Amino acid sequence: MFRALNCDDHGAAVQQNAFGFPRKSSDRWTDNSTSNYRCESGGNGRDSGRNRVRRPMNAFLVWSRDQRRKMALENPQMQNSEISKQLGYQWKMLTEAEKWPFFEEAQRLQAMHREKYPDYKYRPRRKATAQKSHKLLPAASSSMLCKQVHVDERFYPFTYTDSCSRAAHTRMEDQLSCSQPMSTARSLLQQEYHSSSASLRDSPETLAAQMSADASFYSK
């Protein structure tokens, strides 16, 4: 007998599908109260997006519900974003007395929503944030970085003994273009410092004193 009932139920279900009356998704959850609440409240699952419980409408949404439909019929070529802007502007122009009936209707809808979904909590969807790209600095950024390199005598004390060393340092400053990074600029400045120190040791006064000392030594 039990098998016969199952066959009858199966035949009725097949007949229902044959006539084009598919079963609703909510009918599959009527045997379990927990599953029924899960279906209504938009729990985990593939159908959670379609069964998501919406927030109760506020006063503006109550007012704009009919106004949006009316404006869309009067202006079929107008985009939805433009309609929203126009409705927002019109809502601001209304007086408090004109808005009050819609506030009352919104409070009534909120009370009904609390009775129907006592465990409802508003969970806003997180907006997708664009990932930060880790790329090299462009040419403009490197040029700004080069501008921050300041030649200060406290860090690089140059000593000019003649016009040749001054001209060499002038050429070095021309080489510090904005296309070079800061590390390259520092290394070039250090090389110039060492070359300036070497030129200081080999200055004309030092060479003349050395030559006079050698001449007096060989004359003896």
From Swiss-Prot:
Keywords for this protein: Activator, Calmodulin-binding, Cytoplasm, Differentiation, DNA-binding, Nucleus, Sexual differentiation, Transcription, Transcription regulation
DNA-binding region as annotated in the record: 53-121
One GO CC term on file: nucleus
Segments for region (Disordered): 25-52
Database matches in Pfam families: HMG_box
Primary subcellular site in the record, as a coarse category: nucleus
Gene3D superfamilies: High mobility group box domain
Places the protein is found: Nucleus speckle; Cytoplasm; Nucleus
GO biological process: cell differentiation; male sex determination; positive regulation of gene expression; positive regulation of transcription by RNA polymerase II; sex differentiation
Family (UniProt): Belongs to the SRY family.
Function: Transcriptional regulator that controls a genetic switch in male development. It is necessary and sufficient for initiating male sex determination by directing the development of supporting cell precursors (pre-Sertoli cells) as Sertoli rather than granulosa cells. Involved in different aspects of gene regulation including promoter activation or repression. Binds to the DNA consensus sequence 5'-[AT]AACAA[AT]-3'. SRY HMG box recognizes DNA by partial intercalation in the minor groove and promotes DNA bending. Also involved in pre-mRNA splicing.
Protein name: Sex-determining region Y protein
Organism: Canis lupus familiaris
Gene symbol of the encoding locus: SRY
